[in-house]
Every structure is written in C-alpha cells, then in structure tokens.
C-alpha cells in the first residue's frame, strides 16, 4: 500500500502548480478573512484578556545648556581653580608667548570638557555674558577674598565659634568641617579670649586704682605713675620708657584763663618777695628819679654832722675819715647805688 502511494507520487507532476500560480494578494486576503495571521491572533487574545498593547518610546535627552548652574558645578570654575594650581605653570620672563599659548590651551581643554557643543570663542562669549549676573559677581568676590593672604588657614564655609555663646564647649554643635586640631585650639583659646575681653571692659568702666608706690609722699598734686600705662603689645614695636607716665593730652577746660593766670603769677611774685625779705637777701628797688635831690641832701647832712662821742668815754671829738667813708658806702649800698 505504501509502495503504491510512492509510485503515484513519482508520476504526479501537477502537484503544487496551482499554488505557485496563485496571486499573492488573494492569498493575503484569504488569510485576513480566515484570521490565520499570528498578529491578529495575538490581538484577539489580548482583547480577550483585557490588556492593551504598551508602546515604549524613548524620550530624547534635553540639550545641555551652559548656564550659571553648570558654570558653578564641580566641572565648572571650581575644577578650573583646582587644576590651575597643579597643571598650569609659567616659565616667566622671556617666555611670554609660550606662557600665553599654554594658558589658552588650558582654558580650551577645560571648556571643551564643560561644554563640548560650542566652539572655544562661542563658549567664551557665553561665559562673559554670565559673568555680569548678580550671582556670578558675588561668587567672584568670594573667590577673590579666598585668595587674599591670611584666608588659607581656615575654609571659607567654616563657621567659627563665638566665645560669648553658651554652646562653645559642646562638641556636637561644632562644625564637622573644622579639623580636629583647629577645633581643639578654638576651644582652648575661648576662655582666654573671654577673660581678656572682661579685663578690657573693667579697665574702661572702672577708675584706675593707685598703689602705694604711685601716691605722692608730700600730699596733693597728681599721682605719678611709676609704670608705663601704654599697651604692652606696643612695646614689641616701639620701645618706651617704663618710668614715664603717658597721660592723655590736657583738655581745653583744664587750661586756666588769662585772669586766673595773672592772679597766680602775682601771688607767686609776692610770696617770693616776702620770703626774700625774711631771709634778708632781697635788695630794695632803686629809688625813683624824683628822690635823687632828697638823697643828695641826706648825704650832705651826713657829711656835715659831727660824729657822736663813743660811749666808752674816749676823748676824741670826731671820728676818723675812714669811718665816714665806710658810713657813706653803707648808706649807698642800702639804697642800691
């Protein structure tokens, strides 16, 4: 039986000719009508289950813009500042052209990494426009202040401890960005700073107390300080005499007026005259010109007057000429002649 079927197939030349001669459009229409396609079957199955076909579409990434946020990011100016400290080195004098070329190449590489879509000249123009904004001006001022001397000891974003605050000794409230050695130094120096500030306040509001060595022994007058009252810090630069008292300048209210000054001088002059008279060392003033006649008459009378007899009982009637000369000289000395 099987042999007969194989023999018949050998002589059956017309098998499959109709399928080859059939129009492909008709075949597609037949398949659509019968529903034998795989896609239609799957759609029917999805409709029966209640599921809809989910189409996945990939959204295009938004274009990167060169704005303030990108310029201030870690890949922007902060990276430029960090790299310039290590990678950018100049040779100096007689190498100006090569130094400028190296600087431009450094900027070009940085800008290409930051914003590769723009050319170097276009990127520089964009950055120049962004530099006029308020935010960039504030950041530029902060960067300039960080580069000044004396600002490298601490970070710019570190909040320092206030000696007057109540939580200066609390380690939990301290800024974690401060290194431990700086934190320990600030904690140790806070009491000393507060004590120094209190001493300055007391010396300003309370009067200066004089010691026994500063009080004058004769009473009255101003106390003379035996110690220089200048600040001790100034002695490091301006050596001063510690035996001198640096007093404030005399104010206008302390200067005596002219009338008081004249009265004081008159009192001093009268006191000096009385003292000189008491000691017998002050000579009388010269007689005025109108008393010269009286003086001449007195001298003539003294010359004509006979000498008195001595009490010892001598028999001489007149004094010798030497005694008369001495008397005249004594009188002249008394009148200041």
UniProtKB/Swiss-Prot annotation:
Protein's job: Forms a fork protection complex (FPC) with TOF1 and which is required for chromosome segregation during meiosis and DNA damage repair. FPC coordinates leading and lagging strand synthesis and moves with the replication fork. FPC stabilizes replication forks in a configuration that is recognized by replication checkpoint sensors.
Q: Does the keyword Nucleus apply?
A: yes
| Compartment list | Nucleus
Show the GO MF annotations. DNA binding
According to the record's subunit comment, the protein's assembly and interactions are:
Component of the fork protection complex (FPC) consisting of TOF1 and CSM3.
- Predominant localisation class: nucleus
Q: Which PANTHER family match?
A: TIMELESS INTERACTING-RELATED, TIMELESS-INTERACTING PROTEIN
Chain positions covered by the region annotation Disordered: 21-46, 155-177, 191-230
The keyword Disulfide bond is assigned to this record: no
This protein's GO CC annotations: replication fork protection complex
Biological processes, Gene Ontology terms:
DNA repair; DNA replication checkpoint signaling; meiotic cell cycle; replication fork arrest; replication fork processing
Instruction: Report the source organism.
Output: Coccidioides immitis (strain RS)
Protein name in UniProt: Chromosome segregation in meiosis protein 3
